[in-house]
Every structure is written in C-alpha cells, then in structure tokens.
C-alpha cells in the first residue's frame, strides 16, 4: 500500500496492475487478482489508483537540489528543469518532498571535513530560505509527522530534509544534533566512498575496506541518531 503513494501518471499500465494488486486485497481477502480484477479496464484501474493517490499523503523521499535554484530570482516557485518544483508538486499531486543535503566523499582530514560541513550548511540554508523567505505561503518544513499532517491540512506543500553522507559531521558529534535542529530526519553514514563512520559499497569490487563495516565513531553516530530520532539510511 505504501508503494502506491509515489505512483506517477506516466507509470506503465502493467506496473499499475502490480501495485494495486499488491496494495488492496480482493473481496475474498486474498491479494491474488480475481477474475473481476482481471476484467478491470485500463481507465477503471487508473481511476482507482488516482482515488488512492488523492486519499493518502504522497511523498517523494529523495529530491536532489542545486542551491543556485534557491535565490530570489530563480527558485522552486518557477517551473524549472529540475526533479521537483512547487508547480510540479501541485500538478503531480505530491504532498511531501524530501530535499537532500548531499555531500560527495572527500579526504578524511580536517580540511575535508570543514569543506563538507560548509557545503551541507549551504544546502540546509537553501531549503530553509525556500520555506521561510521565498514561498512561506506555499511550503513549510516539517520536523514531525504531526507537522506533516497539519501542513497538508492547511493546503501547503511539505519540505523534509534528508542527509546523504554523514561526512560533513567530521569528528564533531555535536553536529549530528545541529543537523537534527536544522530539520535533518534521515542520514546515511557514507555514500559512494568510505567515510569516517563506515565503509561504502565502493569497496565491494576489490574488497578494499577501511573499517570492516562501521568504525568506532560510526557506532557512536548511530547511538546519537537513535537518541535524536534521525533515521539511518542504509540504501
């Protein structure tokens, strides 16, 4: 059922059949398609999917951003050639977009950590600028699930924040709480490169690992994320 909330109108029809079949049991209580299900026309199927889509809170859990698109003259109130904009959210019936604070992996030293932190803060600030200065009447940052429900009920779009790569934390564990305060609600410990917290999938080809899994501070980071309520992204 959860999968149905991110269906787009361009989804192939065979996928719509699969998603609806998985999402709703038939009258016998089984999720197996019945003869009546098979007889459903394409138009009926799309109508049923749209009914589900409009009934639930829909979300996209990963929308990459470029901070150049968060200025007074160029921003998400316009229909830019980007993954997500406010007009696209309106047209597509998308309620919640998770904007991503992404940082590519760099050297594991103080200079690398500080450059990564500056990059992350620039992206946090851009998201807050959109919601608090550029279009506060159209979108608001949610910090809790209750915020999401309230904002949607008020007729606005919802911004949430995910952090792709914990590299900007450096060795300063206080930054995890800083990122939580800024709205970060999920974070991956590494991304396409070994970080100070954990190994990455990039070591699988030649078995070149840095930590053998989590590092010692990786365990500490997980404990702190659990304390604060930050989901651990292991995708």
Label every PLM stretch briefly:
Residues 1-6:
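N-terminal secretory signal peptides that target proteins for export/translocation
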Residues 7, 18, 35-36:
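Short, intrinsically disordered, low-complexity terminal segments
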Residues 10-20:
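Bacterial N-terminal signal peptides
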Residues 22-208:
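N-terminal hydrophobic targeting/anchoring segments and the immediately downstream early-domain regions
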Residues 189-200, 204-235:
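Active-site core of metal-dependent hydrolases
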């Amino acid at each position: 059922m959860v999968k149905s909330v991110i269906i787009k109108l361009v989804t192939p029809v065979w996928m719509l059949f699969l998603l609806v079949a998985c999402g709703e049991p038939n009258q016998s209580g089984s999720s197996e398609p019945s003869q009546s299900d098979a007889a459903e026309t394409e138009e009926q199927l799309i109508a049923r999917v749209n009914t589900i889509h409009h009934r639930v809170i829909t979300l996209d859990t990963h929308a990459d951003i470029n901070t150049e698109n968060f200025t007074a003259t160029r921003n998400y109130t316009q229909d830019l050639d980007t993954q997500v904009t406010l007009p696209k959210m309106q047209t597509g019936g998308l309620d919640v977009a998770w904007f991503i604070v992404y940082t590519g992996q760099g050297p594991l030293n103080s200079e690398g950590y500080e450059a990564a932190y500056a990059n992350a803060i620039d992206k946090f600030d851009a998201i807050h600028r959109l919601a608090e200065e550029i279009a506060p009447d159209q979108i608001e940052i949610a910090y809790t699930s209750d915020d999401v429900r309230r904002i949607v009920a008020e007729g606005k779009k919802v911004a949430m924040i995910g952090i792709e790569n914990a590299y900007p934390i450096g060795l300063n564990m206080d930054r995890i709480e800083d990122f939580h305060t800024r709205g970060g609600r999920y974070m991956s410990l590494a991304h396409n490169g070994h970080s100070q917290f954990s190994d990455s999938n990039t070591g699988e080809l030649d078995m070149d690992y840095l930590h053998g899994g989590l590092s010692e501070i990786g365990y500490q980071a997980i404990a702190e994320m659990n304390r604060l309520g930050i989901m651990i992204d292991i995708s």
